Amino acid sequence: MDIKVLGPGCANCKRTVQLIEDVARDRAVPVTVIKIEDMREIVGYGVMSTPAVVIGGKVVHAGGLPNRAKVEQWLTAG
């Protein structure tokens, strides 16, 4: 499963990447986290608030750190 984390490299962006990787490891779900820092590409997703998370081409989260339960839901739904 490919998961894109959109953001300029801010602290919450880095924590979002780490949270996704931690939950994936705990759940034994293979994921590839792709960090997107190019603002043109981020805006192309219609995102104005970061970090944002994109799964399957859809923005599933934007703005602030997602909680662990939400990340678990993404990984089990995929």
What annotation goes with each model-predicted range?
Residues 1-19:
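Local sequence-structure signature of Cys/Sec-based thiol-disulfide redox active-site neighborhoods
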Residues 20, 24, 75:
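Conserved hydrophobic residues forming the short capping helix/wall of the S-adenosyl-L-methionine
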Residues 29-39:
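Thiol-based oxidoreductase modules, predominantly thioredoxin-like and allied folds used
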Residues 46-53:
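Structural micro-motif
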Residues 55-78:
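Non-catalytic, surface beta->alpha helical segment in thiol-disulfide oxidoreductase systems
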